[in-house]
C-alpha cells in the first residue's frame, strides 16, 4: 500500500525546468507551479508516452532531478554507511541512485490517469530550513484521497528550496528505503546496493492501464 502511495505522490513532485522555475526561495510556489507544469506535460505528451513509456525517463531527467536534492536524499538512505564509504564508492552510488530515480519516478508518472491535487495554504517560513507541505491527491475514479507531506529543505548556501522526502501515513519514503535496503547494505555494503540500483534502473517502464 505504501509503495502505491509513494508512486501516486511522485506525480506531483516533478519540479519546473530552470527556464520557467518559480521563486526558488518559496517552496509553496515551487510546489504549486511544479504540480501544474507536471500535470500539463503528462496530459499533453501522452502520444509520446504511450508510444514509448521510457520517454518518461527524459521527462524526469529534464523536469524533476535538477530540483530534487538527489545527493542529500541518497546520503540519508545510506545512513551510517555513508561515512564509511570511499569517495569513489559515493560517486558510483550517487550515479546509480540518480539512474534509479529516473526509472522509479518514471514508473510513478506512468500512473497518471487524470488525477488532480490540492496544496495546503502557504504558511510563514520564518527562519525554518525544513518545511512540510501537505498535498491532497484526488483520484477521478473514486479512490479515497491521498494526503501527503512533502519535505522541502532550504539550501544554506543559495537560499533555494528543494524537495527531498515524502511522508505518507506517518511513514517517510527515506525511512522506507532504509528499511528495504538495510539488509543488503549490511551483507554486501554500498557496492552491493550500487549494483542492485544499476540493475533496477535497467527495467523498462510500463504503463498502468486505467481501472
UniProtKB/Swiss-Prot annotation:
Matching Gene3D superfamilies, A to Z? Tgt2/MlaC (3.10.450.710)
State its location(s): Periplasm
Q: Which family does it belong to?
A: Belongs to the MlaC/ttg2D family.
Question: Which InterPro entries does this chain map to?
Answer: MlaC/ttg2D, Tgt2/MlaC_sf
User: Does this UniProt record's set of keywords contain Phosphoprotein?
Assistant: no
* A single GO BP: intermembrane phospholipid transfer
Q: Which NCBIfam families match?
A: PRK15117.1
Per its record, how is this protein called by name?
A: Intermembrane phospholipid transport system binding protein MlaC
Effect of loss of the gene: Mutation leads to accumulation of phospholipid in the outer leaflet of the outer membrane and increased outer membrane permeability. It confers sensitivity to SDS-EDTA.
Q: How does it assemble?
A: Interacts with the MlaA-OmpF outer membrane complex and with the inner membrane ABC transporter complex MlaFEDB, via direct interaction with MlaD.
Q: Where is the signal peptide?
A: 1-21
A Gene Ontology CC term for this entry?
A: outer membrane-bounded periplasmic space
> Pfam family of this protein, just one?
MlaC
**Briefly, what is this protein's role?**
Involved in a phospholipid transport pathway that maintains lipid asymmetry in the outer membrane by retrograde trafficking of phospholipids from the outer membrane to the inner membrane. May transfer phospholipid across the periplasmic space and deliver it to the MlaFEDB complex at the inner membrane.
Keyword terms of this UniProt record: Periplasm, Signal
Amino acid at each position: 500500500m505504501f509503495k502505491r502511495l509513494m508512486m501516486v505522490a511522485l506525480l506531483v513532485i516533478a519540479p519546473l525546468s530552470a527556464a520557467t522555475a518559480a521563486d526558488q526561495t518559496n517552496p509553496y510556489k515551487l510546489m504549486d507551479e511544479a504540480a501544474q507544469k507536471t500535470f500539463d506535460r503528462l496530459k499533453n505528451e501522452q502520444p509520446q508516452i504511450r508510444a514509448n513509456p521510457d520517454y518518461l525517463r527524459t521527462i524526469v531527467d529534464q523536469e524533476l532531478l535538477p530540483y530534487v536534492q538527489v545527493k542529500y536524499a541518497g546520503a540519508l538512505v545510506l545512513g551510517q554507511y555513508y561515512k564509511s564509504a570511499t569517495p569513489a564508492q559515493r560517486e558510483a552510488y550517487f550515479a546509480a541512485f540518480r539512474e534509479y530515480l529516473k526509472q522509479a519516478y518514471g514508473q510513478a508518472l506512468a500512473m497518471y490517469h487524470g488525477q488532480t491535487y490540492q496544496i495546503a495554504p502557504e504558511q510563514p517560513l520564518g527562519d525554518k530550513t525544513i518545511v512540510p507541505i501537505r498535498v491532497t491527491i484526488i483520484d477521478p475514479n473514486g479512490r479515497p484521497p491521498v494526503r501527503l507531506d512533502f519535505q522541502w529543505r532550504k539550501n544554506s548556501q543559495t537560499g533555494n528550496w528543494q524537495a527531498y522526502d515524502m511522508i505518507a501515513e506517518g511513514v517517510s519514503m527515506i525511512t522506507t528505503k532504509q528499511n528495504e535496503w538495510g539488509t543488503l547494505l549490511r551483507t554486501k555494503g554500498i557496492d552491493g546496493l550500487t549494483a542492485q540500483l544499476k540493475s533496477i534502473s535497467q527495467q523498462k517502464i510500463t504503463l498502468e492501464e486505467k481501472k
